[in-house]
């Protein structure tokens, strides 16, 4: 979605030359955020052990046991839960979001970027003015629907027409610690969590 405007003056005299085209600068009223996890290796090790333990009739399995099947990260579901309000309607006349909802969520899948990193998902959000923020929690589920992890609420800083990438150990997260983000940013930023 884009928004733009420009002025043109029309005259009644057909002899006056009018411009063939008019340039309109377009701008997105949206900001994009994306989560990238950097603990894929640890997650695969943990899941291999869990799967081997489950296959052995819930006997304890050590990390040296051979898993019954290879772990395919694309088999896992990622669910993003918006905590609080999520803007979902935009007015072109006021150039601002005009409505928001609670209880919004969306699903994604893990997409491997490297041996240790995977994209968890992304979304576009209408931004009021120049800067804003949304708060999300991220849940990881196996193909049977079992929740494997859930993050604490994470505040995502947003800036209109920019892409914010948040990087951290999200696959192994438990809802116990917090993630903090510096909201003073300019342009596209890749935020790395230790």
Describe each model-derived feature in a short phrase.
Residues 1-42:
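Short, low-hydrophobicity acidic/polar segments
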Residues 15-21, 116, 151-155, 173-176:
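Generic structural signal for short, solvent-exposed loop/turn connectors between secondary structure elements
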Residues 21, 32, 119-121, 163-165:
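Intrinsic-disorder/low-complexity, polar/charged segments enriched in Ser/Thr/Lys/Arg/Asp/Glu/Gln
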Residues 34-36, 45-47, 88-90, 166-168, ...:
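Generic marker of "main functional regions" within proteins
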Residues 43-162, 191-194:
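Tryptophan-paired
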Residues 165-194:
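Intrinsically disordered, low-complexity repeat and linker tracts
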């Amino acid at each position: 979605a884009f928004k733009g405007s420009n002025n043109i003056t029309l005259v009644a005299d057909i002899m006056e030359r009018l411009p063939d085209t008019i340039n309109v600068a377009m701008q997105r009223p949206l900001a994009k955020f994306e989560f990238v996890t950097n603990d894929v290796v640890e997650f695969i090790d943990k899941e291999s052990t869990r799967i081997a333990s489950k296959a052995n009739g819930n006997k304890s399995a050590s990390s040296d046991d051979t898993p019954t099947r290879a772990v395919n990260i694309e088999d896992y579901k990622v669910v993003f839960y918006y905590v609080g309000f999520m803007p979902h309607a935009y007015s072109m006349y006021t150039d601002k979001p005009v409505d928001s909802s609670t209880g919004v969520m969306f699903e994604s899948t893990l997409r491997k970027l490297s041996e240790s990193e995977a994209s968890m998902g992304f979304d576009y959000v209408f931004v009021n003015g120049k800067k804003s923020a949304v708060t999300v929690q991220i849940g990881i589920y196996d193909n049977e629907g079992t929740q494997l992890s859930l993050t604490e609420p994470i505040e995502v800083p947003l800036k209109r027409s920019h892409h914010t990438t948040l990087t951290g150990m999200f696959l192994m997260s438990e809802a116990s610690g917090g993630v903090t983000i510096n909201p003073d940013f300019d342009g596209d930023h890749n935020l790395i969590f230790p």
